[in-house]
């Protein structure tokens, strides 16, 4: 994978989730030459750490796969928080948990509230979600889900008896099962969609970029670290190309348009290095400002999560699969048949609920696992166990990203300000109490051998918050650090109608940094949707027709509307 020329119509910086979509879609126009520059390595088909779903814990913290970011000391947690980001073609879609969640329709209604953002409401986003999906778990008559897109989605199957008991425990706690968390009703408990197809990870690179590589007008260059943007000598706001380093050598490539798709960390960093950001801050780092956009690196959002772990009384969990002696058999089963414990991401089910009556739609997300193990591979000291991941979904805490110097290889200063507001603290206490209430229901009695973490000694609000401060981890959903918004918004960076950086020429942003607000759930699906929609904008194509559909609204619809029991197709 190498570039064949020195000038392109489009140069895409970043071959991650958004960059893979753009590379595939923009190269559909045969008269346009497209180059994707990826700083990481290729996602080789033989690389088990990428391709094997259950190996998802191994790339994180490994310098060959992960940029290994860290926040500064978080002021309200008293420690730094590790952030894994994909250093490989496919970006974080090549190392993430493979969970596919659109978010709640009301997330996008919130996106559309500001002036000029009306084309980002749910009706305008839904056709692009459908365009990217092939949803094998959806009913063939389901008009809300996609059935022939490049991202192949497996439903559940959540057949381990612990899943059924967890879903039933949710019902006993006063909630409902839902037919599809990505369909009419997000609120409730049920199987999740995962980006696993025929036992292999379905990354954005696998789905979009690799099938397009046969095109002569698409080039992909890996291990190409972009160090700066090139500007017109006579127009300081017109981008004409990029400079990148590969194998110690500097290269320059020219472009009619440059599209930043480096993600929520890399995109604002490169903008600031290029003189686009808060003018006074840039001057303090010895950088001449080109465009005063104080929102670059601000409005930073993320989801924080914790694991509540339990000992399992019956030998039905997947804990034995963590035994080193069993791993060769599990690995061989996957290599030769793409089956067995290694063929699943094991995030096969969970749920979304409202923690209080003041919120209009779910503010808590649960991932259930029939195993007790941390994301870094540290397992609980029990023969059998299970856990639930939980955290608030739309915290009002906001952080920032700022470069430390003019050196593009120096990692930026990152602070998310987790737990910085009273509302954030309140929702965290509610999250733990709601999760514990579900896990203590009768449906879990046959398996409940007692809480391992945080443990029965953690009970008061302050004890809960202390535990979250000590044990909380990022859910790896950074976003909104170069947000879309109208020019009238002083903190907006990207024009929502063109995806161009305000005040700049030939420069666009298409990735998670452009999200105006984070969504309720894992953010990979919204990033794919955003990139699909942006591709039509960039190509000057007529956008897909908006699709106005009903979706579940608490307090307006019958509380059982869209629940599993309403549709015989969905029974579990």
Swiss-Prot record:
Catalytic activity from the UniProt record: choline + A = betaine aldehyde + AH2; betaine aldehyde + NAD(+) + H2O = glycine betaine + NADH + 2 H(+)
Which pathway is recorded for this entry? Amine and polyamine biosynthesis; betaine biosynthesis via choline pathway; betaine aldehyde from choline (cytochrome c reductase route): step 1/1
Q: Which UniProt keywords apply?
A: FAD, Flavoprotein, NAD, Oxidoreductase
Q: What is its EC number?
A: 1.1.99.1, 1.2.1.8
Q: Name one GO cellular component term.
A: membrane
UniProt key word Oxidoreductase:
yes
**One Gene Ontology term of the molecular function aspect:** flavin adenine dinucleotide binding
**Binding positions (FAD):** 9-38
Example GO biological process: glycine betaine biosynthetic process from choline
Query: What class does this enzyme belong to in the EC scheme?
Result: oxidoreductase
Active site, renumbered: 477 (proton acceptor)
Cofactors that this protein relies on:
FAD
NCBIfam families annotated for this entry?
A: betA, PRK02106.1
The UniProt function text for this chain reads: Involved in the biosynthesis of the osmoprotectant glycine betaine. Catalyzes the oxidation of choline to betaine aldehyde and betaine aldehyde to glycine betaine at the same rate.
The family annotation for this protein states:
Belongs to the GMC oxidoreductase family.
Output this protein's name: Oxygen-dependent choline dehydrogenase
This protein's species is Staphylococcus epidermidis (strain ATCC 12228 / FDA PCI 1200)
């Amino acid at each position: 994978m190498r570039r064949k020329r020195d000038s392109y119509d489009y140069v895409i910086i970043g071959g991650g989730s958004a960059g893979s979509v753009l590379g595939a879609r923009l190269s559909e126009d045969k008269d346009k030459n497209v180059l994707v520059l990826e700083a990481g390595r290729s996602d080789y088909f033989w690389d088990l750490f990428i391709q094997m779903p259950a190996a998802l814990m191994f790339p994180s913290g490994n310098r060959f796969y992960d940029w290994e970011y860290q926040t500064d000391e978080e002021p309200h947690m008293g420690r730094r928080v590790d952030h894994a980001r994909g250093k490989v073609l496919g970006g974080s879609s090549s190392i993430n948990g493979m969970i596919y969640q659109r978010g709640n329709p009301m997330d996008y209604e919130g996106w559309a509230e500001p002036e000029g953002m009306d084309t980002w409401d749910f009706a305008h986003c839904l056709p692009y979600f459908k365009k990217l999906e092939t949803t094998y778990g959806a009913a063939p008559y389901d008009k809300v889900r996609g059935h022939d897109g490049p991202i192949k989605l497996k439903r559940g199957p959540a057949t381990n008896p612990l899943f059924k008991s967890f879903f039933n425990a949710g019902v006993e706690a006063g909630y409902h099962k839902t037919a599809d968390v990505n369909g009419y009703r997000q609120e409730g408990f049920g199987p999740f969609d995962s980006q696993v197809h025929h036992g292999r990870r379905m990354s954005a690179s696998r789905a979009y970029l690799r099938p397009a590589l046969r095109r002569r007008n698409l080039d992909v260059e890996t291990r190409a670290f972009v160090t700066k943007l090139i500007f017109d000598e006579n127009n300081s706001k017109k981008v004409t190309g990029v400079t990148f380093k590969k194998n110690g050598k500097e290269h320059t490539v020219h472009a009619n348009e440059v599209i930043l798709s480096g993600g929520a960390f890399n995109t604002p960093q490169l903008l600031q290095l290029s003189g686009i950001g808060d003018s006074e801050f840039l001057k303090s780092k010895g950088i001449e400002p080109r465009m005063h956009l104080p929102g670059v690196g601000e409005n930073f959002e993320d989801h924080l999560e914790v694991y509540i772990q339990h000992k399992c009384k019956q030998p039905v969990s997947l804990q034995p699969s963590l035994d080193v002696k069993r791993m060769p058999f599990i690995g061989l089963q996957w290599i030769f048949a793409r089956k067995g414990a290694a063929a699943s991401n094991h995030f096969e089910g969970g749920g979304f609920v409202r923690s209080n009556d003041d919120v209009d739609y779910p503010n808590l997300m649960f991932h259930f696992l029939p195993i007790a193990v941390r994301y870094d591979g540290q397992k609980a000291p029990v023969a059998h166990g299970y856990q639930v991941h939980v955290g608030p979904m739309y915290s009002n805490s906001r952080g920032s990203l700022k470069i430390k110097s003019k050196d593009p290889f120096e990692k930026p200063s990152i602070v998310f300000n987790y737990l910085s507001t009273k509302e954030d603290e309140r929702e965290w206490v509610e999250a733990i109490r709601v999760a514990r209430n579900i896990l203590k229901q009768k449906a879990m009695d046959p398996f409940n051998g007692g809480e391992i973490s945080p443990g029965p000694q953690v009970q008061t609000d302050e004890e809960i918050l202390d535990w979250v401060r000590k044990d909380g981890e990022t859910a790896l959903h950074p976003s909104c650090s170069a947000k879309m918004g109208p020019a009238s918004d002083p903190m907006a960076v990207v024009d929502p109608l063109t995806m161009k950086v305000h005040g700049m020429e030939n420069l666009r942003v298409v990735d998670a940094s452009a999200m105006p607000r984070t969504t309720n759930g894992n953010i990979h699906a919204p990033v794919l949707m955003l990139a699909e929609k942006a591709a039509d904008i960039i190509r000057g194509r007529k956008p897909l027709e908006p699709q106005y559909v009903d979706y579940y609204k608490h307090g307006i619809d019958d509380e059982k509307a869209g629940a599993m029991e309403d549709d015989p197709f969905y029974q579990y």
